From Swiss-Prot:
Its EC number is 2.3.3.15. InterPro entries: DHS-like_NAD/FAD-binding_dom, Sulphoacetald_Actrfrase, THDP-binding, Thiamin_PyroP_enz_cen_dom, Thiamin_PyroP_enz_TPP-bd_dom, TPP-bd_CS, TPP_enz, TPP_enzyme_TPP-bd. PROSITE patterns: TPP_ENZYMES. This is Probable sulfoacetaldehyde acetyltransferase. The keyword Cytoplasm applies. It is found in: Cytoplasm. Pfam families: TPP_enzyme_C (PF02775), TPP_enzyme_M (PF00205), TPP_enzyme_N (PF02776). It is an enzyme of class 2 (transferase). It comes from Rhizobium meliloti (strain 1021).
């Protein structure tokens, strides 16, 4: 069948149902984007490519469907680097389209030329460059399939002079593989260990959400009366109201989850790669059960046993593996110490929820006084925990939320609770600042009838705030964005108070900036609040207005209390050896 290369490209997108593209328009992609309206593909023209990539991540995580990121070759697609690595560690299947400098001039250092394959090699699960115009549909189909199989972004690189050529090809067929279901022997061994366990604990990771395995994990938990922890930043991997839900592990997570998993004799780590940051000690508890039998289930075999000693490794889909383990459990599975375990889970969960609801302030380490001083300097300002409680009071149960990286968002890690998956978007293990805002826009595009609320500190928000100039245009959906204003890079400032004797370098933000006024200037709505009651009222109104098509930025002024440092494991106090003296600075010779 004869068609142009761009027609072939778009027809393959249609075959796969890819209806949304995020990026900035550029000449190298215009032959394709020209066909988007006819094809039923919406192009979301963003203010920056990094934000575009994070919108695509938020869209796909919220919907479970694939979207596309596309930009101009060279300085356009370089903006996708952070976003693609973020999506990679968020296990988000995305299509990244990188038009390349013309094939006949590659290697001559021409306009907007860079080696785009080398650039993204570590950012995607698969990449392929088109070598001949006739192979565009074949390669695109394969790249899309590889993204699904790898559960991560995949890249197609296309020299721009391959467009507007006539080719005679048949469109490729879609070949989908069944997800692996795990090995029978490993599943039988896992079922035996769980059947004999006296204190089984289930740890649900992102794979439970991605694989739609929440119900299956719940059935296992109820059969065993096993408490269920969620992985770091995966609070939506188990219903928070369930009697066996004990909250997230990891940084600023649930003390109940940490205390209970520390008692486990068998841990079923379901759909998780057990990344090391997610199991670091918290609240002074080194909770990972070093003598427990660990059953790790992950669809990627390379990640099983990578960070923890594993007794049984199962390469398989979380849903199918959980179903099979449940079927093979012994009739008396979970009976050993069942009543004592149920009572302890209830007591520990209740005590933590009560403690969490009464925690108002952050502690100082011995020998430091920053948090005490912050409260004394601004006694009328809210603390981060008071802010999070006010937020939880009005956040709709069905809402999708996003959080950014940083101090104030991190303090809130234990607070959000969900009844279903695909409700919690967090930056993940790449940890980029600036994620909260664009990702929630992407989620709203994918789920227009669901209320969405994004959260970011003032430093992180400043990285992606240029999207305020794009989302007020016709056709863009309304969102609600909460910005925590403490006028500092809080996480780095906490490090400085602990290890660098309050020698603050680069930690202070502009106190004269008003994001609410910037929102007004962009034709959006900006509100500033400084009390819990005002925050609750403003957030409730913003969510109500969102349904009417009004975007609101709620700027929350709070005190400068600082939470637990992110990397206590990686920091230490510096020691002067040679010493540094300003007098040693020399004047440079001009070029």
């Amino acid at each position: 069948m004869k068609m142009t290369t761009e027609e072939a490209f778009v027809k393959v997108l249609q075959m796969h149902g890819i209806e949304h593209a995020f990026g900035i328009i550029g000449s190298a992609m215009m032959p394709v984007s020209d066909l988007f309206p006819k094809a039923g593909i919406r192009f979301w023209d963003c203010a920056h490519e990094t934000n575009a990539g994070m919108m695509a991540d938020g869209f796909s995580r919220a919907t479970g469907t694939m979207s596309m990121a596309i930009g101009q070759n060279g300085p356009g697609v370089t903006g996708f680097i952070t976003a693609m690595k973020t999506a990679y560690w968020n296990h988000t299947p995305l299509l990244m389209v990188t038009p390349q400098a013309a094939n006949k001039t590659i290697g001559q250092g021409g306009f907007q030329e860079v080696d785009q394959m080398a650039m993204f090699e570590e950012m995607v699960c698969y990449q392929e460059e088109v070598r001949d115009p006739s192979r565009i549909p074949e390669v695109l189909n394969r790249v899309i399939e590889k993204a699904w199989r790898g559960c991560a972004p995949a890249q197609i690189n296309i020299p721009r002079d391959f467009w507007t050529q006539v080719i005679d090809v048949d469109l490729p067929r879609i070949v989908r593989f069944e997800r692996p279901a795990g090995g029978p022997a490993a599943i039988a061994q896992a079922a035996r260990l769980l059947s004999e366990a006296k204190f089984p604990v289930i740890l649900n990771g992102a794979g439970v959400v991605i694989g739609n395995a929440i119900q299956e994990s719940m059935a296992l938990a109820e059969k065993l009366d096993a408490p269920v922890c969620c992985g770091y930043q995966h609070n939506d991997a188990f219903p928070g109201s369930h009697r066996l839900s004990v909250g997230p592990l990891g940084y600023n997570g649930s003390k109940a989850a940490m205390e209970l998993i520390s008692k486990a004799d068998v841990v079923l780590a379901l759909g998780t790669r057990l990344n090391p940051f997610s199991t670091l000690p918290g609240y002074g508890i080194d909770y990972w059960p070093k003598d427990a039998a660990i059953i790790q289930v992950d669809i990627n075999a390379d990640r099983i046993g990578l960070t923890k000693k594993v007794t049984v490794g199962i390469c398989g889909d979380a849903k199918q593996v959980a179903q099979q383990i449940l079927q093979q459990l012994a009739p008396a599975a979970g009976d050993a110490s069942r009543e004592e375990r149920k009572a302890l889970v209830h007591q520990t969960r209740s005590a933590w929820l009560q403690q969490l609801s009464s925690m108002d302030h952050e502690d100082d380490d011995p020998g430091t006084e920053w948090n005490v001083g912050a409260r004394q300097r601004e006694p009328d300002r809210m603390s981060p925990r008071q802010v999070w409680r006010a937020i939880q009071a009005v956040l709709p149960k069905e809402a999708i939320i996003s959080t950014d990286i940083g101090n104030n968002c991190a303090i809130g890690n234990a607070y959000p609770s969900f009844e279903q998956g695909r409700k919690y978007l967090a930056p993940g293990m790449f940890g980029p600042c600036g994620y909260g805002f664009p990702s929630i826009v992407g989620a709203k595009i994918g789920c227009p009838d669901v209320p969405v609320v994004g959260f970011a500190g003032d430093g992180a928000f400043g990285i992606s705030m240029n999207e305020m100039t794009s989302i007020g245009r016709e056709g863009w959906p309304a969102i609600t964005m909460v910005i925590f204003r403490n006028y500092q890079w809080g996480a780095e400032k906490r490090n400085t108070t602990l290890w660098y004797d309050n020698n603050f370098v680069g930690t202070e933000l502009n106190p004269n900036l008003s994001y609410a006024k910037v929102a007004d200037g962009c034709g959006l709505k900006g509100v500033t609040v400084d009390t819990p009651a005002a925050l609750t009222e403003a957030l409730a109104k913003a969510i109500e207005d969102q349904a009417k098509g009004i975007t609101t930025f709620v700027e929350v002024v709070l005190n400068q209390e600082l939470g637990e440092p992110f990397r206590r494991d990686a920091m230490k106090k510096p020691v002067a050896v040679a010493g540094i003296d300003r007098a040693d600075m020399r004047t440079q010779r001009r070029m």
